[in-house]
């Protein structure tokens, strides 16, 4: 299930736990991170970084992240604003 980072961070603060953050760079890595989160029954930040742009652009990352996040059995935050280009960071937000 996709949720907002604000909601997850508030829940983590109240529950006293940290949230793992994993970068994905293709479909297999996105799937693996979500599958591991489900196996451990923990929420995660599923993130794309601009350094992976040669392998997967931000629009493809959005499609993959939304798909795997929407089908996940645990809370997933899709995080697409890790970059060095201000325009890309704004687009990712």
Please report, for each region that a protein language model flagged, where it lies by residue.
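N-terminal amphipathic alpha-helix/helix-capping segment at the start of soluble metabolic enzymes
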Residues: 1-20
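Generic structural signal for hydrophobic
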Residues: 12, 33, 37, 91-92
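Hydrophobic faces of well-ordered beta-strands that scaffold small-molecule active sites
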Residues: 18-23, 44-48, 76-82
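Short, well-structured secondary-structure segments
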Residues: 38, 42-53
């Amino acid at each position: 299930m996709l949720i907002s980072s604000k909601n997850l961070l508030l829940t983590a603060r109240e529950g006293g736990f940290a949230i793992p953050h994993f970068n994905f760079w293709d479909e297999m890595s996105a799937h693996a991170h979500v599958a591991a989160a489900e196996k451990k029954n923990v929420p995660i930040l599923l993130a794309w970084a601009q350094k992976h742009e040669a392998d997967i652009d931000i629009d493809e990352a959005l499609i993959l992240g939304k798909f795997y996040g929407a089908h996940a059995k645990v809370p997933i935050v899709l995080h697409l604003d890790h970059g060095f280009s201000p325009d890309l960071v704004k687009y990712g937000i």
